[in-house]
UniProtKB/Swiss-Prot annotation:
Domain of life: Eukaryota
Transmembrane spans: none
Region (Disordered): 1-60
Biased composition (Basic and acidic residues): 1-14, 37-48
Compartments where found: Nucleus
Name of the protein: Probable F-box protein At3g61730
Signal sequence bounds: none
């Protein structure tokens, strides 16, 4: 009779008993791990689904949620510090230069080559010249406007080139325009202008104290009032003086004929008044604009000659006329002379002088 233990041993020989660690316990751990992975996947899917639901609901409500991102601001560079405004805008500086006087334009041109190009523009100097001379309309010229400006505002006058030793003082009157090629010269400003009859200049002066001259160069003219010593004698003791209304074309000082002395003044007429003269007067009128110049205030002596006891020389300028007036002390009379200068033998008249000298 076999015991149960032997039966058990026999049974144990026919069957393999699985280890404790690799049996049911191992399968349980695998099942747990697979279940955890499934749960993790499910949670991720549920999270994505919830995020999609939140995003869709936010989009419906008009909200846009953005996450945290890195800074994408541009890094500072040399170009970042450069201003977009350019100091070298030609149109801007051309406009600015219209408000500068001659000295300021020269200083601007001395800054650098770029500003020199701007400052040397002929249109800039034309504007400056017309502005400072207060002449509204430009005329065709043969010289550059920068040279014209310099000759008009550098302090030059006709007695710097001729009879320099006779000159005492001068005063700039201004600029006016002669465009009709015919002018009326007169020594009388009291009452209405006396229009001279036809004839020689001497006859016109004797009859009316005025004369007409033709072939005047059209354009801008500059007028000065000159005070010079007695032109008759060379005595150092003579204290006689002569007043001269000196008018010239704006380009006269730039002409070679004037600078080399080949152009000179010629006496075209004179008028002697052998009685006490209350004032020394002289005027130049453009014949085409005579009527409007007469009513511009020139013939209204009280408006510009000062008080009756004022003996200082006075002058007035109009767009197409110029006049001078100086009150005189008691005298024996006055000698008025008319000079003109031509641009060559048969050229146009480029300068006019009306001078008064006490007898």
């Amino acid at each position: 009779m076999k015991t149960r233990s032997s039966d058990a041993e026999g049974d144990s020989r026919g069957k393999m008993i699985a280890p404790v660690g690799e049996g049911n316990g191992g399968r349980k751990r695998k099942l747990v791990q697979s279940n955890e992975q499934k749960n993790d996947i499910q949670r991720e899917e549920d999270g994505r689904a919830k995020r999609r639901i939140v995003q869709s609901s936010d989009q419906k409500n008009g909200k846009i949620l953005r996450g945290i991102r890195g800074c994408v601001s541009p890094r500072c560079s040399a170009q970042t510090y450069q201003s977009r405004f350019s100091w070298y805008e030609q149109d801007i500086w051309t406009y600015i230069s219209r408000f500068l006087d001659g000295k300021s334009l020269v200083k601007l041109g001395a800054t650098n080559k770029w500003f020199y190009k701007i400052a040397m523009e002929d249109t800039v100097w034309r504007f400056a010249c017309l502005r400072d001379l207060q002449v509204p309309v430009p005329f065709p010229v043969s010289s550059t406007w920068i040279k014209i400006y310099a000759s008009a505002f550098d302090g030059s006058h006709s007695y710097l080139f001729r009879q320099k030793e006779k000159h005492i003082d001068w005063m700039r009157i201004g600029a006016f325009v002669l465009d009709s090629r015919t002018s009326l010269l007169t020594e009388s400003l009291s009452g209405r202008l006396k229009f001279p009859r036809e004839g020689t200049i001497e006859r016109m002066l004797q009859s009316s104290g005025s004369c007409l001259i033709n072939d005047i160069k059209s354009g801008i003219w500059i007028a000065d009032l000159q005070l010079v010593r007695c032109p008759v004698c060379d005595l150092s003791t003579c204290d006689g003086t002569m007043q001269t209304l000196d008018a010239r074309h704006i380009e006269l000082f730039l002409s070679e004929g004037y600078k080399d002395g080949s152009w000179d003044y010629n006496l075209i007429g004179s008028h002697k008044l052998q009685k006490n003269a209350s004032a020394a007067c002289g005027a130049i009128f453009d014949l085409k604009h005579l009527k409007e110049s007469s009513y511009s205030g020139i013939l209204n002596l009280k408006s510009w000659t000062g008080e009756s006891n004022d003996s200082q020389p006075k002058a007035v300028i109009a767009p197409h006329a110029v006049a001078v007036h100086t009150r005189l002390q008691e005298n024996e009379g006055i000698l008025v002379k008319y000079h003109t200068m031509k641009a060559g033998t048969d050229g146009d008249i480029v300068s006019i002088r009306i001078s008064q000298q006490l007898l």
